[in-house]
């Protein structure tokens, strides 16, 4: 009986201690999403240019070259709907200007893509409907002139050091081998298109034009066979790698994609410490923007970013109170975004590790790093000019000294001429 009473006492004591712990210890904080940054490419567009022998010139396209099509508008509306579903419970179901900020490059296609995306993300509810027959509301999209854009329009320039790196890239074995392997092919394409200055770096324009025409049901010329299109596509992907990789990728990143990455890092840090930014920050830009950023992050898959593809940064606060970053890439509309892992970090990357690992590709002073370093020849010229300048300076000082002494010397004795008046 005593043993039974002792067992009950121990059980009661255990329950009491558990109750005290529940009262004294704070509840565990659940992991929560705090901030999202999106970078997406515009939707389907018309070609940005054509070639001399192309039977389809600019008048073939309703709005001309480089413009968003109806297909492109739909792609971004659907992306907006997908984002609305993904961030249900994080974003308000209706648009609140304090929650969202959108910036675009100053191109019609990126501005219109952002607007179509926002139409899918924030359809008007209740009082936001200014017309019962229109399920749309205006939401601001911010931009700066193309010539002033140092954040989203790539490649960034003018940057002499970047141009020097590109010249050095052209001398690498990989570039030289690619050039020699495709010399005859490029000659054939140049002859068929009427282009006279076709290179590894410009042939992407031909592929882009043919791809847009094929996508919109226009008949391609006989020379643009499936094999030719496949080869052009591969060279198009090579041109992206030429812009941001192949040679000195880390330094190129500091001069290109690292500039945008620096802003993203700054925003992540700010939201982890002060929460002073909107919950959703959106950049509407181009395939070159995505490739530049992903090359800086070293997560580029080697292929052109498709229309309406979207790179996602999500900042989480863990139950420990620390912050982590997760990245995703949505490049297929019928599939969930692909998880991306920064090299050297798990997919759920602690914020401090994310900042540490990306630090080497972020410029300290972009303007300064874009300047050309003085080479040996430049140093010799500078030294020679300095020596010549010093000699010239000494000669001038010597000459002035002699002249000063001559003027300061008192006049000597002389005979007075006959008939000369005395003072």
Swiss-Prot record:
InterPro entries: Acid_Pase_AS, His_Pase_clade-2, His_PPase_superfam, Histidine_acid_phosphatase
Record PTM text: The membrane-bound form is converted to the soluble form by sequential proteolytic processing. First, the C-terminal cytoplasmic tail is removed. Cleavage by a lysosomal protease releases the soluble form in the lysosome lumen.
Family in the record: Belongs to the histidine acid phosphatase family.
UniProt-annotated location(s): Lysosome membrane; Lysosome lumen
Cross-referenced SUPFAM superfamilies: Phosphoglycerate mutase-like
Taxonomy of the source species: Eukaryota, Metazoa, Chordata, Craniata, Vertebrata
Catalytic site positions: 42 (nucleophile), 287 (proton donor)
Reaction it catalyzes: a phosphate monoester + H2O = an alcohol + phosphate
Transmembrane segments: 381-401
Key words, A-Z: Disulfide bond, Glycoprotein, Hydrolase, Lysosome, Membrane, Signal, Transmembrane, Transmembrane helix
Pfam families tied to this protein: His_Phos_2 (PF00328)
Regions of this protein lying in the Lumenal compartment: 31-380
Protein name: Lysosomal acid phosphatase
């Amino acid at each position: 009986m005593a043993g039974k009473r002792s067992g009950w006492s121990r059980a009661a004591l255990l329950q009491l201690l558990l109750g005290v712990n529940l009262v004294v210890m704070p509840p565990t904080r659940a992991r929560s999403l705090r901030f999202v940054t999106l970078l997406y490419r515009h939707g389907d567009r018309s070609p940005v240019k054509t070639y001399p022998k192309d039977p389809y010139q600019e008048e073939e396209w309703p709005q001309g070259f480089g413009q968003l099509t109806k297909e492109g508008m739909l792609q971004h509306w659907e992306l907006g709907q997908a984002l609305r579903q993904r961030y249900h419970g994080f974003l308000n179901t209706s648009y609140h200007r304090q929650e969202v900020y959108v910036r675009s490059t100053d191109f019609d296609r990126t501005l219109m893509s952002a607007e179509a995306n926002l139409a899918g993300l924030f359809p008007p509810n209740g009082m936001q409907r200014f017309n019962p027959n229109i399920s749309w509301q205006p939401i601001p999209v911010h931009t700066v002139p193309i010539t002033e854009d140092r954040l989203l329009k790539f490649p960034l320039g003018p940057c002499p050091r970047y141009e020097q790196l590109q010249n050095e890239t052209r001398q690498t074995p990989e570039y030289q081998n690619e050039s020699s392997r495709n010399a005859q092919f490029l000659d054939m394409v140049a002859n068929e298109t009427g282009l006279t200055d076709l290179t590894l770096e410009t042939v992407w324009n031909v592929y882009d034009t043919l791809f847009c025409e094929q996508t919109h049901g226009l008949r391609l010329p006989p020379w643009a066979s499936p094999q030719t299109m496949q080869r052009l596509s591969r060279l198009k992907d090579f041109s992206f790698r030429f812009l941001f990789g192949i040679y000195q990728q880390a330094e190129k990143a500091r001069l290109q994609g690292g500039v945008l990455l620096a802003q993203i890092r700054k925003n992540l840090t700010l939201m982890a410490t002060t929460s002073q930014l909107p919950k959703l920050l959106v950049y509407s830009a181009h395939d070159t923007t995505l490739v530049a950023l992903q090359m800086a992050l070293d997560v580029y898959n080697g292929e052109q970013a498709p229309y309406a593809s979207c790179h996602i940064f999500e900042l989480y606060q863990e139950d420990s109170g620390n912050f982590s970053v997760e990245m995703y890439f949505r490049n297929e509309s019928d599939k969930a975004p692909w998880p991306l892992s920064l090299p050297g970090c798990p997919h759920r990357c602690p914020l401090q590790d994310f900042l540490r690992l990306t630090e080497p590709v972020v410029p300290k002073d972009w303007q300064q790093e874009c300047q050309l370093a003085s080479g040996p020849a430049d140093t010799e010229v500078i030294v020679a000019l300095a020596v010549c300048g010093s000699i010239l300076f000494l000669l001038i000082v010597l000459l002035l000294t002699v002249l000063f002494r001559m003027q300061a010397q008192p006049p000597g004795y002389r005979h007075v001429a006959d008939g000369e008046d005395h003072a």
